Amino acid sequence: MSLRLPSGSRRAGPRPTTGSLRLSGAGASFGAGNACSMPGIGSSFSCAFGSSSSGGNALGGNPCAGFTMNEGGLLSGNEKVTMQNLNDRLASYLENVRALEEANADLEQKIKGWYEKFGPGSCRGLDHDYSRYLPIIEDLKNQIIASTTSNANAVLQIDNARLTADVFRLKYENELALHQSVESDVNGLRRVLDVITLCRTDLEIQYETLSEELTYLKKNHKEEMQVLQCAAGGNVNVEMNAAPGVDLTVLLNNMRAEYEALAEQNRRDAEAWFNEKSASLQQQITEDVGATTSARNELTEMKRNLQTLEIELQSLLATKHSLECSLTETEGNYCAQLAQVQAQIGALEEQLHQVRTETEGQKLEYEQLLDIKVHLEKEIETYCLLIGGDDGACKSGGYKSKDYAAGNMGNQMKDPIRAIVVKKVLEEVDQRSKVLTTRLHSLEEKSQSN
C-alpha cells in the first residue's frame, strides 16, 4: 500500500502492486484495480480491492458502483433504494474481505504444508534419514580399506622382492669381486713362483758349474799325480851323498787335502749363500704374502661394510618410497573426500539459502497480506462508523452485513456521524529516486451531529 501527497515531493510505495493511497485535501482514496467510491460528508472517499494474489488465487475483478452523500444530509431521494444500494456495496465489500481471508488461510495452509514437507525434519539434503544407507556405506568403506590394504601388501611384497633381488645382486657382485681378487692373488703368487723357480734354476746352474770345476780339478790332479808317479818309477839309480829329499807322496797328499778342503769350503760357501738367499727370499715372500693377505682381508671387510651400507641404503630408500606412495595415496583419498564433503556442504548451503530466501519471500508476502487484512479491517470499522456504526452489528469476526434492514438503516441514519481519517506516509527521496526515510502519520477526527 502506498501513499502520495500531491502538495509535497515525498512519496511512499514499498510494493506498487498491492495498492495505493492518495490524499487530496481531507479525502483519501484506495486503488489497486477494482474501485468502489463513496463521496463522504464534505469530502471524497474511494476504495479499491483486487489484484491481490496468493498461491495463484486472484481477488477482485469487477468494479463496484458508488454511492453519494451530500453535505446537507446522509440520504436524499429514495432512502430505501439508497440503503439497498449501500447494503449491496457493503455485502460486496465483505465478500471481497472474506475471499481475501480465505486466500490468506489458503496461503497459511500452503506455508504449513511447505514447512511440513521442507521443514527442519524433512528438508531435502539437510535432515534426511540416511540410516538405511549406513550399512552400504560401511560395507563400501570396508571394501575400500580391504582393497587399500591388499594394494599396500602387494606394493610391500614387490618392494621386498626388489630388495631381495638387490641384495642377491650385491652378493653376486661381491662374490665376483672376491673371485677376481683371488684370481689376481693367484696370478701374483704364480709370478712369485716363477721368480723362485728362476732363482732355483740359477742356483742349480751354479752348482753344476762348481761341480764341473771340481771334477776338472780332480782330473787335473789325477793327471799330475800320474805324471809324477811315472817320473818317479824309472831305472835311474843315482846315488848322491846329499841331504834327504822331499817326500812327494806327503806333498801330494797335502795338496790333495788342500784342494779337497778348498772344494769343501767352496761348496759350503755356495750352500750357505744359497741358503741365505733362499731364506731372505722366502722371508720376503712370506712378508709379501702376509701383507697381501692383510690387505685382502681389509679390502674384503671394507667391501662387506660397503655392501651392508648399500643394502641398508636401498632398504631405507625403498621404505621411503613406499611411505611417500602411501602418503600421496592417503592425501589423494582425503582430498577427494574433502572435495566431496565441501561439494555436499556447498549444495546444502545453496539449498538452505534457497529455502531461507523462499521463506523470507513468503514471510514478506504473508506480512503484506496481513497488513492488507489489518487495513481492510480498519476500513471496515471506518465504513461502519460512516454508516452509523452499531458496535454489535459490524465486527471483523462475524460479517453479517447482508442482514441489514432498511428500517434499521433508517434509524441509524437519524444520528449521522462525521469521521475524517487522514493517513500520511512521508518518504524523503533524493534525486535518484532513492528512499532516504519513511514516516507514517495517522490522524482520526470524529464528530456527531444531532
Swiss-Prot record:
It is found in: Cytoplasm. Residues 79-394 form the IF rod domain. GO terms for molecular function: protein heterodimerization activity; structural molecule activity. It comes from the Eukaryota. One of its GO terms (cellular component) is intermediate filament. Residues 1-78 are annotated as: Head. GO terms for biological process: cytoskeleton organization; epithelial cell differentiation; hair follicle morphogenesis; intermediate filament organization. Gene3D superfamilies: 1.20.5.170, Single helix bin (1.20.5.500), Vasodilator-stimulated phosphoprotein (1.20.5.1160). It holds the Pfam family Filament. Residues 137-228 are annotated as: Coil 1B. Residues 1-24 are annotated as: Disordered. Keywords: Coiled coil, Cytoplasm, Intermediate filament, Keratin, Phosphoprotein. Residues 229-251 are annotated as: Linker 12. Belongs to the intermediate filament family. Essential for the proper assembly of type I and type II keratin protein complexes and formation of keratin intermediate filaments in the inner root sheath (irs). Plays a role in the cytoskeleton organization. PANTHER family: INTERMEDIATE FILAMENT, KERATIN, TYPE I CYTOSKELETAL 25. There are two types of cytoskeletal and microfibrillar keratin: I (acidic; 40-55 kDa) and II (neutral to basic; 56-70 kDa). Heterodimer of a type I and a type II keratin. Heterodimer with type II keratin KRT5 leading to the formation of keratin intermediate filament (KIF) network. Interacts with KRT6A to form filaments. This is Keratin, type I cytoskeletal 25. The gene is KRT25.
